[in-house]
Swiss-Prot record:
The chain crosses the membrane at residues 8-28, 38-58. This is Cardiolipin synthase A. HAMAP family: Cardiolipin_synth_ClsA (MF_00190). It comes from the Bacteria. It is found in: Cell inner membrane. One of its GO terms (biological process) is cardiolipin biosynthetic process. The active site is at residues 223, 225, 230, 397, 399, 404. Keywords: Cell inner membrane, Cell membrane, Lipid biosynthesis, Lipid metabolism, Membrane, Phospholipid biosynthesis, Phospholipid metabolism, Repeat, Transferase, Transmembrane, Transmembrane helix. NCBIfam families: bac_cardiolipin. Its EC number is 2.7.8.-. It comes from Pseudomonas putida (strain W619). It catalyses: 2 a 1,2-diacyl-sn-glycero-3-phospho-(1'-sn-glycerol) = a cardiolipin + glycerol.
Length: 479
C-alpha cells in the first residue's frame, strides 16, 4: 500500500469520519444530559479528528458493565447472606419509618437503594489526626474481617503506617480486604500492593476499563472512602490515605476535612457497597458480618451510595432534595462548586423562600482549572443571593451538608458534575438533633475562619481571569 498516495489519506479521513458517526450515535444513546449529548454528537460528526480520542477518554456517561456485575453480585450475596440473622436489621428499618424529620425528605426512601435505619451510633471526626487515630485504633482491635476502601492511597508515612498495621493483622489471622481506585492511586508502586498480597492481604484496584470500548476510559472513578471492622465499627468521609490529609503539603496545609465513625445496623449497607465494588474488581464476594442484636437507642442513618451505574443521577437528586426540604437553613461545604442547572435552581429557590443558604469553598486551589470554574459559579451564586465563603487557613476538602436542625450528611460526594454523574460516591445521611448540633458547631467555626465573597469581588477580577473562568466552565462537565 502506498502510504504517500492521496487515496490513502482519503481512506484515513473516511475511516475517522465513520468512527466519528458511530461515536456520535453512541453519545446520543448514552450521554445523560441533552446538552452533553448534543455537544458530543455534533463535534464527533463534524470534527471527529479533534474529538474522537477525547470522547473515548471522557465521553461515556453510563457504566453498563458494572450494572451487570452488580446484578450478579446481588444474586450471589443473597445466597451468601441467606443464613445471616436479618431480623434485628429489618426491625431497625421499620423503626426508622416513624421519624417525622426523615419523612420531610420525601424522596429519600426511594432515591437510595439502601433504607434508613434506626439505632446507630455516630461520632464526628474533625480533621486527619482524629480520623486516622480512630481508624487505626479500630483496626488494631479487629478479630475477624477488615474492609478498607480509598480513592487514593499513597506510599508515604501514613500509607506505610496503614500497610504495616494491615500486615500485622493479617499475620494474626484477620481477613483483610483492600480496594483502591486505579486512577486516584496511580502513583502507588506495585511493591506496596505486592508486600500486602504476599502476607495474605487481598488487595485489588478498582478499574473501569473492562471491554474494548472502555479500555481508554479514565472518566469513571471510585471516589468512596469506607472502612468496616468486624461488622461493628465503620468509617466514612472525605479523607484519603496520604500525608497531605494530615497537613503534609505546605501549599495546602492545614488540610480541613471531616470523617464519621459509625456503629450499628447501617454498617450492613457500607458492607454491601464495598461488596459490590469488590465483586466488580475480583468477581468474588468478601465475608459480610451482621451482629445478632443492636442497641435500643441511637440515631437514624441512611447510607447513600451513588454512581454512574445508577438508573438515575442519585447524587445530584440527593442535593436537590436536601435543598428543597430546607425550611430554615442549608449549609454546604465542598472543595469544588460546579453545580448543574437543577442544583443551582434549587439553591436560588431556597434563597427566594427565605432559607439561610451558605456554601463554604476553599481559598486555595488544588486543581486550578476546577478552581477557576468554581469561582465563576460562586460569583453567579452570590448574585442570586447565596452566601458564599472561602475558607482561609488551608485547603478545605470536607463534604458536609446541614439542613435545618436535624438532618446532616457527610461523605465523599462533592458539589460538582463529577460526583453527580461520573464518580462512585457514598454519603452518610444522619437524622438526629444532637449530632446536627455538633455539625453546626463545627461549621460555625469553619465559617468564622472564612471570608465571604462579595459582588465586588467579581468586578475586581481581571478580564483575562474572567476569560479563563468561562473557558473552565465550558469544560466543567468533565472536570
Amino acid at each position: 500500500m502506498d502510504y504517500h498516495s492521496p487515496y490513502f489519506f482519503g481512506y484515513v479521513l473516511g475511516l475517522v469520519h465513520l468512527l466519528g458517526i458511530i461515536a456520535a450515535l453512541h453519545a446520543v444513546f448514552t450521554v445523560r444530559t441533552a446538552q452533553g449529548a448534543i455537544a458530543w454528537a455534533m463535534s464527533l460528526f463534524f470534527i471527529p479528528y479533534f474529538t474522537l480520542i477525547p470522547y473515548l477518554v471522557f465521553g461515556a456517561r453510563s457504566f453498563n458493565a458494572y450494572i451487570k456485575a452488580r446484578r450478579q453480585a446481588n444474586q450471589e450475596m443473597h445466597v451468601a447472606m441467606a443464613n445471616l440473622n436479618w431480623r434485628p436489621w429489618v426491625e431497625e428499618a421499620l423503626t426508622a419509618r416513624e421519624s417525622q424529620s426523615y419523612a420531610a425528605l420525601r424522596a429519600m426512601p426511594k432515591l437510595g437503594r439502601m433504607p434508613c435505619l434506626a439505632n446507630n451510633q455516630v461520632k464526628l471526626l474533625i480533621d486527619g489526626r482524629a480520623t486516622f487515630d480512630a481508624i487505626f485504633a479500630a483496626i488494631e482491635q479487629a478479630r475477624e474481617v477488615v474492609l478498607v476502601q480509598f480513592f487514593i492511597i499513597h506510599n508515604d508515612t501514613i500509607g506505610k503506617a496503614l500497610q504495616q498495621l494491615l500486615l500485622r493483622k493479617a499475620a494474626d489471622g484477620v481477613k483483610v480486604f483492600v480496594l483502591y481506585d486505579r486512577v486516584g492511586s496511580h502513583a502507588l508502586p506495585a511493591s506496596y500492593s505486592q508486600s500486602l498480597r504476599d502476607a495474605g492481604v487481598q488487595i485489588h484496584a478498582f478499574a473501569t476499563r473492562r471491554g474494548w470500548f472502555n479500555r481508554f476510559q479514565v472518566n469513571f472513578r471510585n471516589h468512596r472512602k469506607i472502612v468496616v471492622v468486624d461488622g461493628v465499627t465503620g468509617f466514612i468521609g472525605g479523607h484519603n490515605v496520604g500525608d497531605e490529609y494530615l497537613g503534609g503539603n505546605p501549599h495546602l496545609s492545614p488540610w480541613r476535612d471531616t470523617h464519621v465513625q459509625i456503629g450499628g445496623p447501617v454498617l450492613a449497607c457500607l458492607q454491601e457497597s464495598f461488596a459490590e465494588d469488590w465483586y466488580w474488581a475480583t468477581r468474588q464476594l468478601p465475608p459480610l458480618i451482621l451482629p445478632d442484636a443492636y442497641p435500643d437507642n441511637g440515631v437514624l442513618c441512611q447510607a447513600l451510595a451513588s454512581g454512574p451505574a445508577d438508573p438515575q443521577e442519585t447524587c445530584s437528586l440527593f442535593f436537590i432534595e436536601a435543598i428543597h426540604s430546607a425550611t430554615r437553613r442549608v449549609w454546604i461545604t465542598s472543595p469544588y462548586f460546579i453545580p448543574d442547572e437543577a442544583v443551582f435552581a434549587a439553591l436560588r429557590l431556597a434563597v427566594l423562600r427565605g432559607v439561610d443558604v451558605r456554601i463554604l469553598i476553599p481559598a486555595r486551589p488544588d486543581h486550578r482549572i476546577v478552581y477557576a470554574a468554581s469561582s465563576l459559579f460562586a460569583f453567579e451564586a452570590v448574585r442570586a443571593g447565596v452566601r458564599m465563603f472561602r475558607y482561609q487557613p488551608g485547603f478545605l476538602h470536607q463534604k458536609v451538608v446541614l439542613v435545618d436542625d436535624e438532618v446532616s450528611a457527610i461523605g465523599s460526594a462533592n458539589l460538582d458534575n463529577r460526583s453527580f454523574r461520573l464518580n462512585f460516591e457514598i454519603t452518610l445521611l444522619t437524622v438526629d438533633r444532637d449530632f446536627a448540633d455538633q455539625v453546626e458547631t463545627m461549621l460555625t467555626t469553619d465559617f468564622e475562619q472564612a471570608r465571604e465573597i462579595t459582588p465586588e469581588d467579581s468586578s475586581k477580577t481581571h478580564r483575562i481571569q474572567q476569560l479563563g473562568m468561562r473557558i473552565a466552565r465550558l469544560i466543567s462537565p468533565i472536570l
